[in-house]
Amino acid sequence: CYIQNCPLG
């Protein structure tokens, strides 16, 4: 993911 709170990237 683009957000830092995304565990899967």
Swiss-Prot record:
Glycine amide modification, residue list: 9
Whether Secreted counts among this entry's keywords is yes
Q: Where in the cell is it found?
A: Secreted
Q: Which Pfam families match?
A: Hormone_4
The cysteines joined by S-S bonds are: 1-6
Q: Which superkingdom is the protein from?
A: Eukaryota
> What Gene Ontology cellular component terms go with this record?
extracellular region
PROSITE patterns, alphabetized: NEUROHYPOPHYS_HORM
Q: Which UniProt keywords apply?
A: Amidation, Disulfide bond, Hormone, Secreted
Q: What molecular function does GO assign, one term?
A: neurohypophyseal hormone activity
Q: What is its main location?
A: secreted
The UniProt record lists the keyword Disulfide bond? yes
Q: How does it assemble?
A: Interacts with oxytocin receptor (Ki=1.5 nM). Interacts with vasopressin V1aR/AVPR1A (Ki=37 nM), V1bR/AVPR1B (Ki=222 nM), and V2R/AVPR2 receptors (Ki=823 nM).
Q: What does this protein do?
A: Oxytocin causes contraction of the smooth muscle of the uterus and of the mammary gland. Oxytocin causes contraction of the smooth muscle of the uterus and of the mammary gland. Acts by binding to oxytocin receptor (OXTR).
Query: Of which family is this protein a member?
Result: Belongs to the vasopressin/oxytocin family.
Protein name listed in UniProt: Oxytocin
Q: Which organism is it from?
A: Oryctolagus cuniculus
Which gene underlies this protein? OXT
